[in-house]
Amino acid sequence: MQNKRSFFVCNSSPTCRGRRILAIYYVKFYNEALDLHEVRRKTTDDFIIVYLSNDVSDFELELTWLKDHPQPYNLGECEFHLAFQAEDYEAAHKKHKEMGCICFENEAMGIYFIVDPDGYWLEIVP
């Protein structure tokens, strides 16, 4: 098995009751929006870590839920972000538009951003 590299996104949304429900909600978003699926999970009394990947890349996205974090994380100015290359850019754009998760489009550059349930911007490139 390849050694996969992980990206970390920490989720602390207080809007969902129960960490299990929250984990399902975030995993569902990333699966539907970016075709990432869960490859492994670590669950303790204090946190849940879920690793997402696809069958194309050797990268993993790490989602972490901290039980006792009292408020949403400060996302800064969103200058740091992840970019995902779409195999079918037009189909991806249509799907994201239907999902209502497009938060910014730059037609001149031929890119757009979607926003995850925590407010992280994810760039979509052709």
Predicted regions and their residues:
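Eukaryotic phosphotyrosine signaling hubs
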Residues: S13-T15, E77-H81
